């Protein structure tokens, strides 16, 4: 009998701490729920919206805008692009989208559209093209030192009048009184000629 009594006491001594721990764990959520309910009930009397938001998180405030996702088939943009709705914009501001066949395989958990939208590639004038290595070395042209001593010439056309004829005609006017001298001067006077001469002066 004494052996059985010691056996029961040792079993109870070993199991009592575990039973006590289980009872404490069960009591804690109940106390917290009572405190939360009491606290939320007090708030709900004054601010019912906050009470609903705390009870149902699906009605919580959404700080992010809901935008439609337009997947772009571009090797440089592998992530989804959030496009603004086109209906809000004026016709002048709408983007020109190219509809291309879907080349990305559809995942089993997501349904993808049959077509994908993509921005048109910018024109080459907007892209910066790096210079080639050959263009970095500028060649210095060889200059002829003999030709550089003379200034660059531009051809000009001038009309030259024979000045001897003009001088001789003045002599004719002066010698009208003397007929003998006038005949000699008239015989020696050539006709006035004009000629075009091309000069290379600057």
Curated annotation (Swiss-Prot):
The record marks 126-127 as: Cleavage. GO terms for cellular component: extracellular space. Mammary gland specific. Secreted in milk. Residues 1-21 form the signal peptide. It comes from the Eukaryota. Keywords: Glycoprotein, Milk protein, Phosphoprotein, Secreted, Signal. GO terms for biological process: lactation; protein stabilization. The modification Phosphoserine is found at residues 148, 182, 199. Glycans are attached at residues 142, 153-154, 169, 175, 182, 198. It is found in: Secreted. It holds the Pfam family Casein_kappa. Belongs to the kappa-casein family. Kappa-casein stabilizes micelle formation, preventing casein precipitation in milk. This is Kappa-casein. It comes from Saiga tatarica (Saiga antelope).
